[in-house]
Amino acid sequence: LMETSLIAKVLILLLPQITIFLGVPIYMVLAARKAVFSGESVFGLRFREAYNLNRKLDVAIDWDDEFTWRSFANVYILVFIFTIITSVNHALGANLFFSIPVLTVTSLLLGIWVGLMALWLDENTGVSALITLFIILFCAILIPLFSEFDFTTGYFAMFLGICILLLIILEICRCFRIIEFSRTGHRFTAYLGAITFSLYLLYDIDLLLRADASQNNWATASQIAYYLYLDIVNLLLYLLEIFAEG
């Protein structure tokens, strides 16, 4: 493969995946808004005209259609399977010729899932979440560039480790209903998730900027790109929850 800087390698690997992940839900929302008036379907899904409390168009999914339920279930199962495959693949350090196709399929499925979630909740919150994501990402790039603080220090990594551990515990409690969460509890978890992965963006971007020449290889680029990918995906999911909770 061609000789490039580590940053260029990361961008080559990351940008297509993020484009797919964000492009699919944007397309789904725009297509659904058009289909609600034309009566057409999008990926087999049908929609009804509805409005939110602010009197903005809020496309409603037609839940009476059995295909809709099957679509949600099938996409959820496929997202789970390919997320596990992708995680195991990167943990084992598989080569790029296997990693890229698997991650591409994962990005496509995650994009469809996020699109379905945005349409299910309120696509207007999806737009707000997306704008917020770009603002956070822009700040996460600028801060390490112009700040003298080292975000890759052991203390900062330890703090992030504590945050992610707490987040995992809360998510397990939510998933298996070990503790009955109030609305405040759900909001706290969502904000903790958004803050944690925003800080992880800072950490991983600073890690990339501080990498030396010995780390300029495709294996390192693949790992850093994957970490940044996880940061962005998880951050968007928590932002969607925050805006959906209102």
What residue spans do the PLM features occupy?
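A hydrophobic alpha-helical transmembrane-helix feature that marks the membrane cores
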Residues: 1-246
